[in-house]
Amino acid sequence: MQPPGGDAPAGCPFSGARAAQPAQAAHEAPHVPGEADAQAGWHNAQLDFSKSMSYGDYLSLNSILDAQHPLSPDHNEMLFIIQHQTSELWMKLALFELRGALDAVRTDALPPAFKMLARVSRILEQLVQAWNVLSTMTPSEYSAMRPYLGQSSGFQSYQYRQLEFLLGNKNAQMLQPHAHRPDILEQVRATLEAPSFYDEVVRLLARRGFPIAPERLERDWTQPMRHDETVEAAWLEVYRHPQQHWELYEMAEELVDLEDAFRQWRFRHVTTVERIIGFKQGTGGTSGAPYLRKMLDVVLFPELWHVRTTL
């Protein structure tokens, strides 16, 4: 169909005609990268590492890739080991970033802290996705290797325990699984006895002029946090006047992002456990899925969640 009042323009999609092409383009074949192109891309790369540090040297890959020692003849145990080892590496980075952010908050250097907190949230997203890989293991596959695990359990992860303590979920009884390793026990105990990240943020609120109750600012750091009205009142002021308290407003949202991601990690842990072992007791002696479901009720930053109802 032609538009009213004249011929269809060249190349009009409704005319049935094709637009004219340059004569040269009609005869040119598309360029297909060949061996010469590939050679040009790496021929200047260093190939001799007999006297210099290589990629594998820098990353200590020999040690990392030689750290998987399945105890069973079952094919699926390698997945189980690597899943947990990589999770421990991500937790190591999460602890490193959280402690860096904590140091920044103590010196009122909030922009660097925001960057580190955002990174921790992305790390937690990686940990959430990792459960999708482990969930490819079926109940029968796990049952074949479970007898070889003994009493070992993720419940005994000292990095996870430090992460919980650093985020404020304190419980002195959780030191006991590490009593057989004095070096590890000292690390975990130090995290238990120190202010959590959120404790330092509450101190920041006080430094910014908010009237925080003295008993909230100096307390027994080994005890879990409880909701504090003066802290919620401070956050209420921040949320009602974000332009006046922009850094604190951004801090609040970074913390909510962080706890949101942490909750998702916990939830995927529960569903993966239920999918693979159902409601059996955990290898470490916990009730398994019911224990993990109970942990879903733990709130790390209570005032930041409750203030949303008050607003």
Swiss-Prot record:
Keyword terms, alphabetized: Dioxygenase, Heme, Iron, Metal-binding, Oxidoreductase, Tryptophan catabolism
GO molecular function per UniProt: heme binding; metal ion binding; tryptophan 2,3-dioxygenase activity
Organism of origin: Burkholderia cenocepacia (strain ATCC BAA-245 / DSM 16553 / LMG 16656 / NCTC 13227 / J2315 / CF5610) (Burkholderia cepacia (strain J2315))
Cofactor, how bound (note): Binds 1 heme group per subunit.
Reported function: Heme-dependent dioxygenase that catalyzes the oxidative cleavage of the L-tryptophan (L-Trp) pyrrole ring and converts L-tryptophan to N-formyl-L-kynurenine. Catalyzes the oxidative cleavage of the indole moiety.
Pathway: Amino-acid degradation; L-tryptophan degradation via kynurenine pathway; L-kynurenine from L-tryptophan: step 1/2
Keyword Iron: yes
Biased composition range(s): Low complexity: 17-27
One Pfam family cited in the UniProt record for this chain: Trp_dioxygenase
Reactions this protein catalyses: L-tryptophan + O2 = N-formyl-L-kynurenine
Gene designation per UniProt: kynA
Keyword hit for DNA repair: no
Protein name per its UniProtKB record: Tryptophan 2,3-dioxygenase
Region (Disordered): 1-37
Enzyme Commission (EC) number: 1.13.11.11
Subunit architecture: Homotetramer.
SUPFAM superfamilies listed in its UniProt record: Indolic compounds 2,3-dioxygenase-like
Residues the entry annotates as binding heme: H269
Positions with a binding annotation for substrate: F80, I81, I82, Q83, H84, Y142, R146, T283
An annotated GO BP: L-tryptophan catabolic process to acetyl-CoA
Superkingdom of the source species: Bacteria
Record family assignment: Belongs to the tryptophan 2,3-dioxygenase family.
Cofactors that this protein relies on: heme
